[in-house]
Each structure stands twice: as C-alpha cells, then as structure tokens.
From Swiss-Prot:
One of its GO terms (cellular component) is proton-transporting ATP synthase complex. It comes from Aeromonas hydrophila subsp. hydrophila (strain ATCC 7966 / DSM 30187 / BCRC 13018 / CCUG 14551 / JCM 1027 / KCTC 2358 / NCIMB 9240 / NCTC 8049). Keywords: ATP synthesis, Cell inner membrane, Cell membrane, CF(1), Hydrogen ion transport, Ion transport, Membrane, Transport. This is ATP synthase gamma chain. Pfam families: ATP-synt (PF00231). It is found in: Cell inner membrane.
Amino acid sequence: MAGAKEIRNKIGSVKNTQKITGAMEMVAASKMRRAQDRMSASRPYAETMRKVIGHIAQGNLEYKHPYLIEREVKRVGYIVVSTDRGLCGGLNINLFKAALNDMKQWSAKGAKVDLALIGNKASNFFERHGAKVKAHVAGLGDNPSVNDLIGSVKVMLKAYDNGEIDRLYLVYNKFVNTMVQQPRVDQLLPLPVTEDSKLAKKHHWDYLYEPDPKQLLDTLLIRYVESQVYQGVVENLASEQAARMVAMQAATDNAGNLINDLQLVYNKARQASITQELTEIVSGAAAV
C-alpha cells in the first residue's frame, strides 16, 4: 500500500485537476449560450433559404443552372466542419465516422473523394489517413463570420464548376440539445429537391425572375451554399461547447469520486501506520 504522504499528494493533485475541469465546465456553459444565440438567429434564414432552393429545384425553369443538374458521379466533394480543440467527448470522432461511412459508399461505386476541411481536428484526422485535401481553414474562434469561410467554399464551388467534383456534401454536428449532437451529411450540390413531398404535389414552384434567371440564380445559389456552410459551422460550434460542458462535468464528478476513494485509502494507510507504531511501542515496552 502506498504511504500516507504519497496518497495525500495524489489527493491534492486530483483536487487541482477538479478545479480546472470545473472552471472549464463553467466557461463552456457560457460559450454554449452565446453559440446557441448565434445559431438560433441564423437558423430561420438557412432553413427558409433551403426551402426556397428546394422549390426552385422542382420548378420548370427556362434557364437550367448547372447546380440544378444531376450528372454522373465520378468524384465527390465534402466540406467537413470540426473543432479546433479537443476535450469535447466523442463529438469529432462520431462526425468522422459518419463522413467515412458516406465516403466508403461512394468509393464502392468507383467515385473519388476530395475534401475541404474546417477545424484542426478534421485536418489532423484526414491528412493522417491520406485523404486528398483541397482546402483547409482553422482558427475561426467563437464568433465566425461568413467571410472566414468563403475561401474554402469557393475552392469547392470552382471544382464543381470545372467538373472536378460531381456532388458536394456538408458534414457537421447538428445541435439538438445540450445532451444530443447529431452528425449530419447534407447534400449541397446538385441542389436537393424539397423534402415536403405533399407540398410539392399540390404546387408547381415556377418563379418569375428579375432582371433575368441566370443573373439572379448565379448569385442566389452561391449565397445558398455559403449560408448552409455557415449554419453548419455555428451548429457545430454550439455542439462543441455543449459536448465540452458535459465532458468537463463528467470529469469533475469523476474527480470527486476519485478523491473520495483516495481519502478512504489514505485513512486506511494512516490507520495502518498508527497501528504499526503502537505495536512497536508495546513490543519495546514488553522487551524492557
């Protein structure tokens, strides 16, 4: 059994760690609330944009934008949104598993895969696995803007325009609640039709465009992709802070349990030490 002094040092070390994880839990909770506010503010715009674009994809357009046309898939692109830092449980690894599963399905069909990565964790993971990375951005902080993402988005859009990729997906963690973050693989291009099939049957979504369909769609569809990527980033940020808060809470609780266990061991060691001293005293007195 370890000595009482050694156990006491371990208890002190665990208590210091507990203070750190407790502080990180409070910081993550504060950041999560701010991230939720940004996510809630941008979500209605992103969802409405998705619905409108879905309706446009079903319409009988005179001008058929390239982003609306299905083509043979020889190469698939993914924009993967991860975190820059760890200590957020299995958030990133669960996301990477979802991405890899989707990539394997396309690889089985003979398609190649290109990646644009957001966050250091994605870069470290996929570069270690030998993936082809066309763009990478990191260090977005706790308050990212669309301008921070435009570079990576443009790289993938240019690749799509040039026929270098035939389908584009966004991979991110959707914030459901504090305890649940759901890995998502959403198709960006070609534009998916609206999921509301009942509504689609009742209506034919034909629009009148001013000044002309090409000019408007060229701008609108790029804004659509940018808005979806931005929404994915803020959703992932809220998910990161929630996962980190839960992980740090669990670490703090585990530290408390470990301290209690060590305290019992310390008490037993101290009791054994006292018993041994008393035994030695009695033995010495008897010898005299």
